[in-house]
Amino acid sequence: MSDRTYNVLFLCTGNSARSILAEAILKREGGGRFHAFSAGSFPKGEVHPAALAQLAELGIATEDYRSKSWDEFAAEGAPQLDFVFTVCDNAAGETCPIWPGQPMTTHWGIEDPATVVASDHNGGEGQRQAFRLAYLAMQRRIRLFLALPLESIDELSLQRKIRVIGQTADEGASVA
């Protein structure tokens, strides 16, 4: 097994929910093989409170997560990226900066849990559920990604497999 560490950037427009969740999942489950980052094309400037609550509920420390611009990752001195995943449809349609390292890119669209409004009549349960489902959907995709033989697979096959992962929504899915 290689000692190589891969740099992975997750993008969504606001960098306040889905991309933050993805960054946290990969940091937690990546086994030290990955440096996970997240950013947005138009960052909101703060992480959605329900995203932080979802992470905290799972025992993930939240103090290091912040909403930031993707410009940080296109600037001189930024980490050379190996993979860039857009996780919202808006970011997938935008013209991205030139990333250092010429990373593989693909789209892993996840419904935006932040569009579910917390209501007082149910104690915000609908919004909590939306964030929980977004977390689980992203976790499934990241686990499929982590199972790929990155050190031994050819580039074309790897690109195809990470694209297929983005189309995967089923619990028991695999990437053939």
Question: What does each model-found stretch correspond to?
Answer:
Residues 2-75:
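Conserved active-site segments centered on acidic
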Residues 16, 89-92, 112:
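Short glycine-rich anion-binding loops that position phosphate/pyrophosphate groups of nucleotides
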Residues 86-87, 107:
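Redox-cofactor binding/interface segments in oxidoreductases and associated redox assembly factors
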Residues 79-80:
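Alpha-helix C-terminal capping/helix-to-coil transition sites in glycosyltransferase folds
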